[in-house]
C-alpha cells in the first residue's frame, strides 16, 4: 500500500499533548509511526562518549508519534486534510480530498 504521508510533508497533530501544532515529517518508520520536527519532544539522559566527542547531559529530541494522530496540512485551505490517489499520465499521484489539488 502506498504511503499517504511521506517525508517532507507538512502535518498537523490531531491528538495528544502537541495537538494543533504543525511540523515537517523527518522520518517515516515501518511500524506506522512518524518522527516530526519539533513535535513530541522528550528529554533523554545521554552518557558522555569521549571517542565520539559527545558531551553527556540531558538532551531534548523528537520521539515517534502514531501516524493516526496526525493529518497532512493543506496550505491552500489552511486546514488538516485527507489524501487520495489517482492516476495522471500513467503515474500514481496524491491529491487533497477537499479541493482535488495535487500534494506537492
From Swiss-Prot:
InterPro entries to which the protein is assigned, alphabetical: KOW, Rib_uL2_dom2, Ribosomal_uL24, Ribosomal_uL24_KOW, Translation_prot_SH3-like_sf
SMART domains: KOW
GO cellular component assignments: ribonucleoprotein complex; ribosome
Pfam family, one: ribosomal_L24
Keyword annotations of the record: Ribonucleoprotein, Ribosomal protein, RNA-binding, rRNA-binding
Molecular function via GO: rRNA binding; structural constituent of ribosome
UniProt keyword RNA-binding, yes or no: yes
One GO biological process term: translation
Origin superkingdom: Bacteria
Family per similarity comment: Belongs to the universal ribosomal protein uL24 family.
Subunit structure: Part of the 50S ribosomal subunit.
HAMAP family documented for this protein: Ribosomal_uL24_B
Functional note: One of two assembly initiator proteins, it binds directly to the 5'-end of the 23S rRNA, where it nucleates assembly of the 50S subunit. One of the proteins that surrounds the polypeptide exit tunnel on the outside of the subunit.
Protein name per the record: Large ribosomal subunit protein uL24
Originating species: Shewanella pealeana (strain ATCC 700345 / ANG-SQ1)
Amino acid at each position: 500500500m502506498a504511503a499517504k504521508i511521506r517525508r517532507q510533508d507538512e502535518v498537523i497533530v490531531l491528538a495528544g499533548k502537541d495537538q494543533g501544532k504543525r511540523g515537517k515529517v523527518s522520518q517515516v518508520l515501518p511500524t506506522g509511526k512518524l518522527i516530526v520536527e519539533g513535535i513530541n519532544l522528550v528529554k533523554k539522559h545521554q552518557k558522555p562518549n569521549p571517542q565520539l566527542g559527545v558531551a553527556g547531559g540531558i538532551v531534548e529530541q523528537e520521539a515517534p508519534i502514531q501516524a493516526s494522530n496526525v493529518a497532512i496540512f493543506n496550505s491552500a485551505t489552511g486546514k488538516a486534510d485527507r489524501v487520495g490517489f489517482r492516476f495522471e499520465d500513467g503515474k500514481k499521484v496524491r491529491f487533497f480530498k477537499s479541493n482535488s489539488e495535487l500534494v506537492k
